A protein has these predicted regions:
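Short, Lys/Arg-rich N-terminal segment immediately upstream of the first membrane anchor
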Residues: 1-6
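Solvent-exposed, non-transmembrane regions of membrane-associated and secreted proteins
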Residues: 7-191
């Protein structure tokens, strides 16, 4: 090996290392940057903007905001729960009650980004769900459970109101798409 090829090999190794870092950080960085744009879109929605999409080509828009005071969580909830939507934030599951209305509100998110904090929730913790009229609805966590995806009747009619937060499980799984789901159930505070 000549002395001239050593700098080239070093440069190639540097580029490969940088590429590996960028590839590994892509999803967390995208999730972080999207939250800034989503916060601005949420403010536009609260002000009554007709189009509150976070960027012009977005196929979703902010629908609500979820906060958990003890953990310092504050996230915009998007309309829909497709993979493209969930790449940017938690999403409202179609067919469930809309945030702020009576019924079973279901919100899903990825276990390794936006809903990683679900594993730290405790029974009795408060969840605040803000709707686009600016009102906060307070819920208390009553249960966290692990279910197989086939046994979750998330959209079944229920007696009373509740909020369910849903993510894949286990939180530290190496590969995505497992059959287990982590479900947090919360009832309106004072109920």
């Amino acid at each position: 090996m000549s002395l001239m090829s050593l700098p080239r090999i070093s440069l190639l190794a540097l580029f490969l290392g940088a590429g590996s870092f960028v590839y590994g950080a892509y999803i967390p960085l995208k999730a972080w940057a999207a939250q800034i744009l989503l916060d601005m879109a949420w403010e536009r929605r609260l002000q009554g903007a007709a189009d509150s999409r976070p960027w012009p080509w977005a196929d979703t828009a902010p629908l609500a905001r979820i906060r958990q005071p003890r953990l310092g969580i504050d996230q915009v909830v998007l309309e829909g729960s497709s993979g493209r939507v969930l790449a940017f934030g938690p999403g409202h599951v179609g067919g469930s009650a809309r945030p702020g209305s009576a019924g079973n509100v279901v919100i899903s998110g990825h276990r390794d980004t936006h809903f990683r904090w679900l594993q730290r929730l405790q029974n009795g913790d408060e969840l605040l769900l803000q709707t686009d009229d600016g009102r906060d609805r307070s819920y208390r966590v009553v249960q966290s459970a692990i279910h197989h995806e086939s046994e979750i009747g998330l959209l079944e009619p229920l007696q009373g109101d509740q909020l369910r937060l849903l993510t894949c499980y286990p939180f530290d799984a190496v590969s995505a798409g497992g059959a287990q789901r982590y479900v947090v159930t919360a009832y309106p505070a004072g109920a």
